[in-house]
């Protein structure tokens, strides 16, 4: 189980420039992540995704995010996300714990 507070710090430092998490939050360079868990790739309403993201067809959850966040461009070739990934499994676990909580509120 990840540490939500550590995950929040990771999000703030590495993700918050491009993403929001709150319900009704604006899309930035990347989509708002509210409702992420259980949603198919490329489905946030009002955000312009690449065909690669739309066509990946997986459902976001702990396992898919764990793999994606390690190396986004390897997991979804053609994604426009510029983030190179979190190599530390602990950091990914903490970030996922935060995202699970923050995107469900």
Curated annotation (Swiss-Prot):
Broad class of the protein's primary localization: mitochondrion
Post-translational modification: Binds 1 heme c group covalently per subunit.
SUPFAM superfamilies: Cytochrome c (SSF46626)
Entry keyword set: Acetylation, Electron transport, Heme, Iron, Metal-binding, Mitochondrion, Respiratory chain, Transport
One GO CC term on file: mitochondrial intermembrane space
Binding sites annotated in the UniProt record for heme c: 15, 18-19, 81
Modified residues (N-acetylglycine): 2
GO MF entries: electron transfer activity; heme binding; metal ion binding
Subcellular localization, as worded in the UniProt entry: Mitochondrion intermembrane space
Superkingdom, taxonomy of origin: Eukaryota
Family per similarity comment: Belongs to the cytochrome c family.
Chain's role: Electron carrier protein. The oxidized form of the cytochrome c heme group can accept an electron from the heme group of the cytochrome c1 subunit of cytochrome reductase. Cytochrome c then transfers this electron to the cytochrome oxidase complex, the final protein carrier in the mitochondrial electron-transport chain.
PANTHER family reported for this sequence: CYTOCHROME C
Record protein name field: Cytochrome c
Lineage: Eukaryota, Metazoa, Chordata, Craniata, Vertebrata
């Amino acid at each position: 189980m990840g540490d939500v507070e550590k995950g929040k710090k990771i999000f703030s430092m590495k993700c918050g420039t491009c993403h929001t998490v709150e319900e009704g939050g604006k899309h930035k360079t990347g989509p708002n992540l509210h409702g992420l868990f259980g949603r198919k790739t490329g489905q946030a309403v009002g955000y312009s995704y690449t065909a690669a993201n739309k066509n990946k067809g997986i459902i976001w959850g702990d396992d898919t995010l764990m793999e994606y966040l390690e190396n986004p461009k390897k997991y979804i070739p053609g994604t426009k996300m510029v983030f190179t990934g979190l190599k530390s499994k602990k950091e990914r676990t903490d970030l996922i714990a935060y995202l699970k909580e923050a995107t469900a509120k």
